[in-house]
Amino acid sequence: MMTEFGSAMTLVTGLVAYGAYVKSKRQSNHYLLKTNNNFDVEKENFNYNNNNNNNNNNNNNNSNNNDNNNNNNSNSNNNNNNNNNNNNNNNNNINDKQINGTNIFDSNNQIKRRLFD
């Protein structure tokens, strides 16, 4: 009788111990799942923030490029204005050097050899 009772108690103790082991295993797995999920969320946030930073950098670069383009355009406009002014000055100089309305200089600002062809 005592032997049967002892073996039954051993069996119960074994089952309780096994149940506790399974429960602790489940909890640790649950904890692992939670931490893995958190890690994924953190990773997504990190990637999202990186993408935002990249977009901001691209936007800044684009605005810098636009500024540079505007500067280039204004520089080329200034150059065009300077060229136009120079051309006007050259034309004025040539127009001053005429005989009876005929330019005595050719387009290279050289004196024409034959004025009246």
Swiss-Prot record:
Record's keyword terms, sorted: Glycoprotein, Secreted, Signal
Glycosylation sites: 61, 72
Sequence segments annotated as region (Disordered): 42-117
Biased composition (Low complexity): 46-95
Signal sequence residues: 1-24
Polar residues biased stretches: 96-110
GO annotation, cellular component aspect: extracellular region
UniProt-annotated location(s): Secreted
This protein's record includes keyword Signal: yes
Residue stretches spanning the membrane: none
Protein name per its UniProtKB record: Putative uncharacterized protein DDB_G0287599
The organism of origin for this protein: Dictyostelium discoideum (Social amoeba)
